[in-house]
Swiss-Prot record:
This is UPF0122 protein BPUM_1495. It comes from Bacillus pumilus (strain SAFR-032). It comes from the Bacteria. InterPro entries: RNA_pol_sigma_r3/r4-like (IPR013324), UPF0122 (IPR007394), UPF0122_fam_protein (IPR054831), WH-like_DNA-bd_sf (IPR036388). It holds the Pfam family UPF0122.
Length: 110
């Protein structure tokens, strides 16, 4: 699993965990946040590794569907990028008009 995918899943889990069942939250938390292996999670819950794998894959797909519809992570990244640009512009105070335009763009995201 790539670091990029892990980071994305961690963000999606943060944004959408309230929409998951207790079991889904637990499996995802153990797998992504606590870095448990499938076998360790299976032992903890007394189920097969395949059951854990299937649950995690289904939950990942659900998180991606939530993001596709709600776009919370996308908007978060856009806000983060706009804020970065704003900080750069504030450092160069000669470009206040561009800073105001970025602020307006940021306000429209919410």
């Amino acid at each position: 699993m790539t670091l990029e995918k892990t980071t994305r899943m961690n963000y999606l889990f943060d944004f959408y965990q309230s929409l998951l069942t207790a079991k889904q939250k637990s499996y995802m938390s153990l797998y992504y946040l606590d870095d448990f292996s499938l076998g360790e999670i299976a032992d903890e819950y007394e189920v097969s590794r395949q059951a854990v794998y299937d649950n995690i894959k289904r939950t990942e797909a659900m998180l991606e569907q939530y993001e596709e519809k709600l776009l919370l992570f996308k908007k978060f990244k856009e806000r983060k990028e706009l804020l970065k640009k704003m900080r750069e512009l504030v450092a160069d105070s000669a470009q206040t008009e561009e800073a105001e335009a970025l602020i307006e763009s940021l306000e429209k995201l919410d």
